[in-house]
């Protein structure tokens, strides 16, 4: 009973190890690596199973044989496993049979062939009895089936293992301890990372990972807050100011609206004009002129900074920085007023957000003014509520009209828009052509599939018809074989009878009775046997069980046939 308990305990521990691996690494999860504690548990259970109640055998040189010798003896008869055997034998650093057996287990786990290898090893029960005692679970049919079922479940788990380890002669590699303690204490090296494993990114305590700001709103808000701080009244250092202007220029370029946004806004302006809404053409022209003026001021500041940097003297004064800040705030206020008059339905939005959009989306304002400038033929009627609001702005910005007209008449921007539109149209045509080609390919594949389906059905029908015909022919051949067997038996029986008659005639001397071997005299009555034809005296023909005209031998055979 104690032996049965030990056997069941070994089988149960192996099942638990397999279930732990399936729970942690099954269903397409990450592969099992050297640092997995479940791997160490599984390898230990497999080694205990293969070493339990193993008979002691020694080689020619006196070395003790282990379960590797059993696996090698069982698998070398199968051609499909010669490559694995040669791979294990080619590892010169493994000196013992125990180390080679461990390497073979790891190789089968990595290739998903452990269950198949074990099943091939257990196909020959006589060989298994030569290597293992009666207490081994490998000799019990029920436990053997349970073990193979558990091992076949591991075929769906990926194992990422090092197949050429020189330290398997000593023990199984135990890298899971390195997670809790340093490698210097344990004395074992840390395993290398598998290919494709992401590298760790280490940050200091005060650092944070910065994600790219796609919208650019946080950068703009920080820039605006910095413009409003009183620290900007102080003169900036010459080494930091050019980089600041470069960053602002790059942010303004990266935040330019794409062509789709421009088309949407242009359609909105056209709908407003058709509905008779407010027409902010003059206000947009004034804001465009002010923006152009601020741009020219920024260029002057940049040129001054560049010249001073080359000469190595001077710095940018605080008044110019304040002027730039005031220009940005003025453009924000003008854009807020224009947006409030053009789109009354958008009053729920925050004014600060609209101001930031106006500050850094200068190409949007230029595109809108260009569209309004090209549509000079459309009627422009200003309502009375607009007259009081825009009259002051028109008087103040009357000197900036020529500059705005130059911006409107600039054909370079229109050419850029036309190029972008042509590129988008080309991309659309290419995508439509690709879609059409894919649809044609899909239709062809469907037709081919239908054709193949019809051919498959025809082949199946033909195969069924041939199968029925072959079955009929097979039945006929079976009947013929049975008839031939019966005829052969009849011929054999007839041959035996003829041989028996011939033997009887050859043994009986002429002039003697077949039954009692009596010598016939001149007056003795004699009768021929009606079956074999031999001469029988009157006593033998009448007294033998009342069978007349029959010798005793033929009478016995006839009795046997009747029974």
From Swiss-Prot:
As recorded in UniProt, coiled-coil segments are 421-462
The record's PROSITE patterns line, in alphabetical order, gives: RUN (PS50826), ZF_FYVE (PS50178)
Annotated compartments: Cytoplasmic vesicle, Autophagosome; Lysosome
Q: Where is this region: Disordered?
A: 176-327, 375-397
Location of the RUN domain: 33-166
One GO biological-process annotation of the entry reads: multivesicular body-lysosome fusion
* Predominant subcellular localization, coarse grouping: cytoplasm
Stated induction or repression of this protein's expression: Up-regulated by IL4/interleukin-4 in bone marrow-derived dendritic cells.
Residues bound to Zn(2+) 2: 529, 532, 551, 554
Q: Where are the zinc fingers (FYVE-type)?
A: 428-558
Is-annotated flag, keyword Translocase? Answer: no
Q: What happens when the gene is disrupted?
A: Knockout mice exhibit increased trabecular bone mass due to impaired bone resorption, a phenotype associated with reduced lysosomal maturation, lysosome trafficking to the membrane, ruffled border formation and cathepsin K/CTSK secretion.
- What does the entry list as the binding residues for Zn(2+) 1? 513, 516, 537, 540
- Source taxon at top rank: Eukaryota
Q: Which GO terms describe its cellular component?
A: autophagosome; endolysosome
Q: Which InterPro entries does the record associate with it?
A: RUFY4, Run_dom, Run_dom_sf, Znf_FYVE-rel, Znf_FYVE_PHD, Znf_RING/FYVE/PHD
Q: Which Gene3D superfamilies does this one have?
A: 1.20.58.900, Zinc/RING finger domain, C3HC4 (zinc finger)
Regions of biased composition (Polar residues) lie at: 285-295, 385-396
Q: Extract the GO molecular function terms from the UniProt entry.
A: dynactin binding; phosphatidylinositol-3-phosphate binding; zinc ion binding
Biological role: ARL8 effector that promotes the coupling of endolysosomes to dynein-dynactin for retrograde transport along microtubules. Acts by binding both GTP-bound ARL8 and dynein-dynactin. In nonneuronal cells, promotes concentration of endolysosomes in the juxtanuclear area. In hippocampal neurons, drives retrograde transport of endolysosomes from the axon to the soma. Positive regulator of macroautophagy in dendritic cells. Increases autophagic flux, probably by stimulating both autophagosome formation and facilitating tethering with lysosomes.
The record's comment about this protein's domains reads:
The RUN domain and the FYVE-type zinc finger are essential for its function in the positive regulation of macroautophagy. The RUN domain is involved in interaction with RAB7A and LAMP2, while the FYVE-type zinc finger is required for binding to phosphatidylinositol 3-phosphate.
Quaternary structure, per UniProt, is: Forms homodimers (via coiled coil domain). Forms a ternary complex with RAB7A and LAMP2; the interaction with RAB7A is mediated by RUFY4 (via RUN and coiled coil domains). Interacts with GTP-, but not GDP-bound ARL8A and ARL8B. Interacts with dynactin/DCTN1 and the dynein intermediate chain DYNC1I1/2.
Q: What is this protein called?
A: RUN and FYVE domain-containing protein 4
List the source organism: Mus musculus
Q: What's the encoding gene here?
A: Rufy4
């Amino acid at each position: 009973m104690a032996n049965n308990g030990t056997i069941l305990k070994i089988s149960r521990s192996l099942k638990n190890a397999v279930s732990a691996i399936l729970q942690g690494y099954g269903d397409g999860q990450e592969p099992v690596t050297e640092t997995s504690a479940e791997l160490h548990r599984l390898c230990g259970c497999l080694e205990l199973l293969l070493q339990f109640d193993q008979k002691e055998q020694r080689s020619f040189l006196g070395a003790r044989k282990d379960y590797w010798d059993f696996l090698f003896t069982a698998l070398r008869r199968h051609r499909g496993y010669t490559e694995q055997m040669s791979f294990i034998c080619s590892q010169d650093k493994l000196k013992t049979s125990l180390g080679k057996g461990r390497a073979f287990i790891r190789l089968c786990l990595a290739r998903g062939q452990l269950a198949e290898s074990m099943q091939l090893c257990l196909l020959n029960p006589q060989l298994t009895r030569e290597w293992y005692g009666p207490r081994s679970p490998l000799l019990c049919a029920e436990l053997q089936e349970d073990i193979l079922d558990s091992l076949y479940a591991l075929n769906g788990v990926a194992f990422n293992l090092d197949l050429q380890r020189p330290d398997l002669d000593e023990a199984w590699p135990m890298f899971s301890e390195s997670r809790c303690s340093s490698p210097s204490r344990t004395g074992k090296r840390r395993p290398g990372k598998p290919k494709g494993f992401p590298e760790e990114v280490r940050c200091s305590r005060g650092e944070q990972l910065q994600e790219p700001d796609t919208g650019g709103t946080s950068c703009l808000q920080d820039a605006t807050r910095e413009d409003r701080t009183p620290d900007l009244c102080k003169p900036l250092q010459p080494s930091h100011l050019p980089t600041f202007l470069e960053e602002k220029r790059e942010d303004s370029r990266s935040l330019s609206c794409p062509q789709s946004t421009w088309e949407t806004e242009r359609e909105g302006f056209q709908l407003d004009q058709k509905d008779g809404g407010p027409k902010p053409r003059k206000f947009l022209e004034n804001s465009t002129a002010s923006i152009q003026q601020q741009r020219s001021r920024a260029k002057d500041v940049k040129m001054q900074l560049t010249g001073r940097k080359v000469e190595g003297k001077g710095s940018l004064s605080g008044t110019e920085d304040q002027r730039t800040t005031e220009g940005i705030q003025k453009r924000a206020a003008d854009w807020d007023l224009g947006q409030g008059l053009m789109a009354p339905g958008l009053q729920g939005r925050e004014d600060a957000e609209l101001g930031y959009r106006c500050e850094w989306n200068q190409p949007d304002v230029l595109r809108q003014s260009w569209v309004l400038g090209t549509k000079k033929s459309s009627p422009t009627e200003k309502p009375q509520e607009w007259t009081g609001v825009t009259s002051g702005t028109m008087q103040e910005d009357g000197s900036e009209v020529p500059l705005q007209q130059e911006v409107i008449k600039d054909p370079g921007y229109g050419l850029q828009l036309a190029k972008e539109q042509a590129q988008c149209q080309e991309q659309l045509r290419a995508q439509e052509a690709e879609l059409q080609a894919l649809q044609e390919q899909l239709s062809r594949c469907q037709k081919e599939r239908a054709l193949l389906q019809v051919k498959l059905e025809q082949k199946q029908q033909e195969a069924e018809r041939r199968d029925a015909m072959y079955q009929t022919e097979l039945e006929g051949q079976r009947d013929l074989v049975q008839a031939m067997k019966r005829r052969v038996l009849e011929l054999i029986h007839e041959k035996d009878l003829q041989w028996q008659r011939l033997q009887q005639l050859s043994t009986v001397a002429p002039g003697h009775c077949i039954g009692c071997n009596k010598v016939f005299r001149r007056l003795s009555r004699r009768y021929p046997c009606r079956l074999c034809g031999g001469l029988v005296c009157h006593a033998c023909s009448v007294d033998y069980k009342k069978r007349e005209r029959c010798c005793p031998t033929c009478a016995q055979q006839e009795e046997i046939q009747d029974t």
